[in-house]
Structures are given as C-alpha cells and as structure tokens.
Regions:
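Conserved N-terminal Rossmann-fold NAD(P) cofactor-binding segment
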Residues: 35, 39-77, 91, 310-318
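Rossmann-like NAD(P)-binding element
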Residues: 58-119
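C-terminal substrate-binding/catalytic lobe of Rossmann-fold NAD(P)-dependent dehydrogenases
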Residues: 138-144, 154-318
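A short, basic/flexible loop-to-alpha-helix module at the beginning of a structural domain
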Residues: 1-9
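Glycine-rich Rossmann-fold phosphate-binding loop(s) that bind the pyrophosphate
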Residues: 16-17
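N-terminal Rossmann-fold NAD(P) dinucleotide-binding loop
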Residues: 20-21
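Rossmann-like NAD(P)(H) cofactor-binding subdomain of soluble oxidoreductases
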Residues: 92-158
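Conserved S-adenosyl-L-methionine
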Residues: 29-35, 139-142
Length: 318
C-alpha cells in the first residue's frame, strides 16, 4: 500500500472567526509553516483574512497564506478546527454543545473523505466534548486528535501566580486539569515555582494567607473568559498563543508536557472520556499521560468533572 504523503510544512485552519484568524496570525509569525490554508463557510471571509494576514509576510518569513477548500486538508500536517458558534455573554461553554456538534457533523466527515493522516487540533468549544466527537467521526487514532483543553487556563493560572508572587510566569509550574470550563480543577498539590512548593514560595514572597489568595486566583482564572466576553464580546489572543504553542510542540516533536484535551484511559480511575490532563506531546500527537500528584480532594473533583462530561457525551447522537 502506498504511504500517504504529508506536507510537513502545511497547516489548515477551519473557521475564520476571531479565534481562527488570530491563530493564523500567530502561526504566520512562528516560522513553523510555509503554507497555511484558511477554510470557512463564508469564502469571502476566508479570502479577506488570508489577504490581510498575508500582507504581514514581508515582516516574517516566506510562505503562502490563502483561502481554500476541504481538498486542501489531504496532505496537511495539521488541521486546526476553530469553527463553531461563539460563547455569548451569560452562556457557558457547555451551552454550545448542540450547536457545535451539528457543525462538527458537517466538518469532520469532509476531512475523513480526504484520508487526512496528520494531527487534528480541536479548538472550538466545548473543546472536551468536541474532541471526543472528532475522534468518533474522523476515524483517526485517538492519539492524533487533540483538543486545546486547559492549555490556556493553565497559562492564565501561571500568569496570575507570577503576578501575585512577582516572579517570571515561565518559572511557575502549575496545571489546571479536567474540563475546559466550570468544573475545571486546579492541581495545587503539584504546583511549584522552579521546584519550590507553591505554599513555601508564597511565604518567601511575603504572602502568608496563601490559601485565601490561591482560592481567589483560581476563581479569577475560571471567570476570566466570562469577564473578557462581557467586556469585549470574545476571547482570542490568549487562545491564539495557545494554538501556536501546541503546534510548535507537535511540529518540532518537542515531547513537551501540555494539559491538552485527549482520551483518558485508566488515569485516576477515569476511562473513556476526553478531558485535559498533562501529557507528553510530540510529532505523533499524544505519547503518554503524566499522572501528576493530586490530593484526595483534587482527584475527587477531577472524577466529578469527568463524570459530568461523560453524561453529556451519552446524550449526543453521532
């Protein structure tokens, strides 16, 4: 059987709304690709975004950015799916389930028809549900279908902790796991700053009410998307940087550990559901889970998060 030929420098973005367009803009500056294709139900929108972003190429590196169609996914290394109804003020990510599952039912089979053999990155919300939907509809191996998950939530947490402690957020190691949404869990038990446990670091920096402070930070992180949506109607810059980072890890085969959404089997007594847990990510997608230390309470909350997602999946007909 002839081996499928993949263009390792080609990416396809499906969905050219705020998130898709901002992500392409970030990817254009990354140097990862020489070809980026934009696909949208509104062809004019895709063409306009491609034209606008292309005008920045002289300040980046040579590449082609253009509007295309589903035939362009055939040889792509990675397909990013941001298409879907956006979250409106007052809505939760899970409120988007039925609308966006219907959209995925029209998108994923079109990708499957082209015998796509690269990595599929799901960004649309609710990302955990849609990642599992994409796995079922695409026929791709589970390790090659990844959701952006809590990569952005974890970045928000690290940013807030860095700000609180007056340290570089890149030195903060902390994960949010579970659902990318209201049942997300902060893994405080494993949080540290360059190897120093978070509680110790808080006291070293003069913060002695660290339980109250961290609870306040966790709430701020969980509610940040709602706050941004209320103020400017959509979030897109943070997730665009998250998409860029995930693509870097995949395209460079970095084997970095990221809290992406993927199918979980047997970790913390969770099985058969897609949610975010730290995993080693490389050129072939998910390599293995990293079962970080959790307290009993954190493990229980994670199981509750998984159970809530499972119940929603059981209501979806595919």
């Amino acid at each position: 059987m002839k081996k499928k030929v993949i263009n390792s420098k080609k990416a396809v973005m499906i969905g050219c709304g705020f998130v898709g367009s901002a992500s392409v803009f970030a990817l254009m500056q990354s140097g990862l690709f020489t070809e980026i294709v934009l696909i949208d139900a509104d062809k004019n929108k895709a063409e306009g975004e491609a034209m606008d972003i292309s005008h920045g190429i002289p300040f980046a590196s040579p590449m082609k950015i253009y509007a295309g169609d589903y035939d362009d996914v055939a040889d792509a290394a990675i397909v990013v799916i941001s298409a879907g109804a956006g979250q409106k003020p007052g809505e939760t990510r899970l409120d988007l389930v039925n609308k966006n599952v219907a959209i995925f039912k029209s998108i994923i089979p079109e990708i499957a028809k082209r015998n796509f053999a690269g990595i599929m990155l799901v960004v649309a919300n609710p990302v955990d549900i849609l990642t599992q939907v994409a796995i079922k509809l695409s026929g791709l191996p589970e390790n090659r279908v990844i959701g952006s998950g809590t990569v952005l939530d974890s970045a928000r947490l690290r940013y807030k902790l860095g700000e609180h402690l007056s340290v570089d957020s890149r030195s903060v190691h902390a994960f949010i796991i579970g659902e990318h949404g209201d049942s997300e869990v902060v893994a405080w038990s494993s949080a540290n700053v360059s190897g120093v446990p978070l509680s110790e670091m808080c006291e070293m920096r003069g913060h002695y009410k660290h339980k109250e402070d961290t609870a306040e930070i966790a709430t701020a992180v969980k509610n940040s998307a709602y706050e941004i949506i209320n103020k400017k109607h959509a979030t897109y810059y943070g997730i665009a940087m998250s998409v860029k980072r995930i693509c870097e890890v995949i395209m460079r085969d970095e084997k970095s550990i990221l809290p992406v959404s993927h199918m979980i089997h047997g970790v913390y007594d969770i099985d058969g559901v897609s949610l975010s847990m730290p995993a080693i990510v490389g050129a072939d997608g998910i390599e293995s889970d990293i079962p970080i230390n959790l307290s009993g309470e954190e493990a229980l909350k994670l199981k509750e998060s998984a159970d809530s997602l499972k119940k929603i999946m059981e209501t979806i007909e595919l």
